[in-house]
Each structure stands twice: as structure tokens, then as C-alpha cells.
């Protein structure tokens, strides 16, 4: 739970709880269902919960007060990307799946995952990434937050989409030079 301007706010993910929270004094993470979150708001004197927009839409929640902008509140690597895995030997399924693939999304996911790999990050790491493609140029930004949001480092890189792995690795290396390992170790 975090306290901000006298409000008690719960985040359901470590990355969400760490982001932009240097002004908050305390927090805790909750992994449970929307019903549990709703009950927590009612029963534990909580004022708000930070949850993903996908969850709000899926659950058809109409009470959301604000949708946070992705450049202010960066998502986790690969957030919102649907991945389907199949066996190499299953040629029929692979042909069907190849028709569904969006090439730009693959390049974005590849760059974001390359950053995570360099940082040895996972879904519990307080690492955020945001990528975009315009005119065949991939731009990737990433941030790492300390456990309570007191510290944040960021890096970005861009280049041709064909270099998505290199772009992601460059961002990861920039973050390491800025102290990423120390921040990530303090969060675990």
C-alpha cells in the first residue's frame, strides 16, 4: 500500500508499485481477484487500486477514474502481446499461425525481451519498457525502479527494425552502466 496526499493506494504488481512512487511512504503488493480488491477497498480503508487496463476492460469495470499514459507509467516488457507457441513439426498449425503474426509486434517484443535478458529480468522485476515503430525505425525506452520508487534510471535507443535485438541489448547495457544491477538486487 502506498500513501499519497493522505490516500491509501494498492498496486497489484511490483513494477506498478515501484513506478513514480518516490512521493509514497509505504506499499504492499496484492495478487488476487477483482472481487478481493473491491472488498479490500471497502474493508481496509483503501482509496484506490492500480491495475492494468486490460484487466479493467476484461472485467468491464466502469469505476476507473484515470487511465495512466504509457510514457508516464511505462508497461512491463511485452505487456499486451499475445504469444502462441507450437511445435516445429506441426506444419499445418505453423502455417495458420504465420498468417496471424504482426511483424512489427515481433520486432518490438524481441527488443524488449533482449533488454530483459541483458538485465536478467523476469516478470517480478521492476523493469518497464515501451517500444514503438515509425518508418521502419524501432525506438525502445526502458526504466528500472527501486522497491519504493525512490530511485529510477532510464535509457533508450533506436535503429532499424532489423536490429531489434541489438537495440534491446544496447538499452540493457546502458541501464547496467547506470546502476541497474544494484537497484534490481535491492528489490529482490
Where are these regions (language model features)?
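Small-molecule-sensing regulatory modules
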Residues: 5, 18-188
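Short, well-ordered beta-strand elements
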Residues: 7-13
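Short beta-strand-centered segments that line the small-molecule binding cleft or hinge
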Residues: 1
Amino acid at each position: 500500500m502506498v500513501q499519497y496526499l493522505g490516500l491509501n493506494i494498492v498496486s497489484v504488481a511490483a513494477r506498478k508499485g515501484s513506478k513514480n512512487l518516490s512521493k509514497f511512504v509505504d506499499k504492499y503488493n496484492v495478487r488476487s481477484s477483482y472481487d478481493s480488491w473491491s472488498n479490500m477497498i471497502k474493508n481496509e480503508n483503501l482509496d484506490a487500486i492500480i491495475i492494468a487496463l486490460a484487466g479493467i476492460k476484461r472485467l468491464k469495470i466502469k469505476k476507473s477514474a484515470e487511465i495512466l499514459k504509457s510514457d508516464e507509467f511505462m508497461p512491463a516488457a511485452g505487456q499486451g502481446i499475445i504469444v502462441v507457441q507450437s511445435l516445429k513439426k506441426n506444419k499445418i498449425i505453423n502455417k495458420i499461425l504465420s498468417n496471424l503474426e504482426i511483424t512489427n509486434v515481433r520486432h518490438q517484443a524481441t527488443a524488449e525481451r533482449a533488454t530483459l535478458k541483458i538485465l536478467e529480468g523476469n516478470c517480478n522485476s521492476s523493469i518497464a519498457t515501451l517500444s514503438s515503430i515509425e518508418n521502419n525505425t524501432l525506438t525502445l525506452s526502458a526504466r528500472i525502479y527501486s522497491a519504493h520508487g525512490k530511485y529510477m534510471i532510464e535509457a533508450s535507443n533506436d535503429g532499424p527494425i532489423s536490429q531489434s535485438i541489438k537495440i534491446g541489448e544496447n538499452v540493457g547495457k546502458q541501464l547496467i552502466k547506470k546502476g541497474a544491477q544494484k537497484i534490481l538486487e535491492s528489490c529482490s
